[in-house]
């Protein structure tokens, strides 16, 4: 299964493959290698016409790669052979321990490629630091991963994060096992295609073997590869987590919302109020302006973002100024709307302006030495096709600027410093 000529699902044996076609393709692959005098591990690719059924004379040569390819684990899973070890044996001049006619296939294996990309926005590549990464461990399940938690996915290399390979007695069972594994996979930070892959494993046409290389493009909406409505339930959970883990932020937000310097909401005491009061303040959810309502009666905190729907399990991971959430395989990111206004409180910041997310600096609106006032716009960052203004947390003087317009910056990157009147204490 492929998208834009890039494979995303590989399996063995191929659905619809007959023994006659397998024999014909295998012999053609051997003939190609012999024709060029190649000795070593290699992968020969063919394309087959499926409209009238797969036939021994209905395939054509595409290319040969003189190496193992990404999908070799599905072959290993159904043959029980270690192709990498065999590759080393050939390179060392040894003979292979098994003849072709002795290779037997058992069961079915399916591999899914997890990419750092955004299916909801045209599969645009995604980059950034990996906030959380966890894969399930189960029988007949293999995970090959090339990154680590806290590692960074950059835009300079292939966005492949990992491969998950599931094996089972039948194709349907293998697809079910893979879909379940994808449901349990956690990738937070860069956007990923995990949820999309799970939907693909459950797609009726694919499960029935009724597909071709254009299947994904024809079924994008059904597979969840289209802009989705805001996940308000996850957003509410994120706001609750944001507030529960940062009482100082609660105090600053409450003070900003009420304009009451001595309001009991300003006390950093874990919402120890005797009576219920509702606070409304703006947040950013995936870059979208959202108004969250928070009510606390001294015992419990309730967060509402319009109709949040029924309660569901939400995985939440705090990373700096953001809460990354995963619900039903879909990632949401919750941040306070005015990052730097929050930092205006002495307890929350020292005038250092950092990038709230990965993006491109569109404009730097001040110069070193400029006098600025609290709330003044300092720079503009573009991320996910949206512009985000960075504002001064305090009155003061611009003492340092480390970026220029047009530069790509990572989340948390130091951009500039505002020195308060009298300097830092």
What are these regions (language model features)?
Residues 29, 52, 69, 73-300, ...:
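Catalytic cores of soluble metabolic enzymes centered on carboxylation/carboxyl-transfer
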Residues 343-425:
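Structured functional modules or segments
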Residues 10-13, 22, 26-34, 88-89, 158-164, 349-351:
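Short amphipathic alpha-helical segments
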Residues 317-355:
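Catalytic P-loop NTP-binding/switch module of NTPases
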Residues 38-69:
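Conserved metal-phosphate-binding beta-hairpin within the catalytic cores
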Residues 1-27, 68-83:
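ATP-dependent carboxylate/phosphate-activation module, predominantly the ATP-grasp catalytic core
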Residues 295-319, 326:
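N-terminal accessory interaction module
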């Amino acid at each position: 299964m492929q998208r834009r000529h890039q494979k995303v699902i590989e399996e063995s044996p191929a659905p619809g493959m007959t023994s006659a076609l397998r024999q014909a393709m295998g012999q053609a692959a051997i003939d190609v290698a012999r024709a060029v005098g190649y000795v070593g591990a290699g992968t020969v690719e063919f394309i087959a016409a499926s409209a009238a059924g797969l036939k021994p004379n209905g395939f054509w040569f595409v290319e040969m790669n003189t190496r193992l390819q990404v999908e070799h684990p599905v072959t290993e899973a159904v043959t029980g052979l270690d192709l990498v070890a065999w590759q080393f044996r050939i390179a060392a001049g040894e003979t292979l321990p098994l003849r072709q006619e002795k290779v037997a296939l058992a069961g079915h294996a399916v591999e899914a490629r997890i990419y750092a990309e955004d299916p909801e926005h045209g599969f645009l590549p995604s980059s950034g630091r990996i906030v959380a990464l966890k894969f399930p461990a189960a029988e007949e399940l293999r995970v090959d991963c090339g990154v680590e938690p806290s590692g960074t996915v950059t835009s300079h290399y292939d966005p492949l994060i990992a491969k998950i390979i599931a094996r089972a007695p039948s194709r349907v069972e293998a697809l079910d096992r893979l879909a379940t594994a994808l449901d349990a996979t956690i990738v937070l930070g860069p956007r990923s295609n995990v949820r999309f892959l799970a939907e693909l494993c459950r797609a009726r046409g694919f499960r029935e073997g009724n597909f071709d290389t254009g299947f994904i493009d024809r079924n994008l909406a059904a597979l969840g590869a289209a802009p989705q409505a805001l996940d308000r339930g996850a957003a509410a959970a994120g706001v609750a987590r944001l507030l529960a883990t940062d009482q100082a932020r609660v105090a600053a937000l409450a003070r900003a919302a009420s304009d009451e310097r001595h309001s009991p909401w300003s006390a950093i005491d874990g919402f120890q109020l005797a009576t219920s009061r509702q606070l409304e303040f703006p947040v950013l959810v995936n870059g979208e302006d959202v108004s969250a309502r928070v009510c606390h009666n001294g015992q419990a905190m309730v967060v509402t973002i319009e109709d949040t729907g029924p309660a569901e399990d939400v995985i939440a991971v705090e990373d700096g100024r953001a809460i990354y959430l995963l619900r039903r395989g879909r990632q949401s990111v919750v941040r306070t709307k005015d990052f730097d206004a929050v930092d205006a409180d002495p307890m929350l910041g020292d005038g250092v302006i950092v990038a709230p997310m990965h993006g491109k600096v569109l404009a730097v609106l001040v110069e070193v030495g400029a006098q600025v006032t609290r709330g003044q716009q300092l720079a503009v960052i573009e991320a996910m096709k949206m512009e985000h203004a960075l504002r001064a947390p305090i009155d003061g003087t611009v003492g340092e600027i480390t970026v220029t317009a047009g530069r790509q910056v990572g989340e948390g990157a130091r951009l500039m410093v505002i020195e308060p009147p009298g300097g830092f204490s």
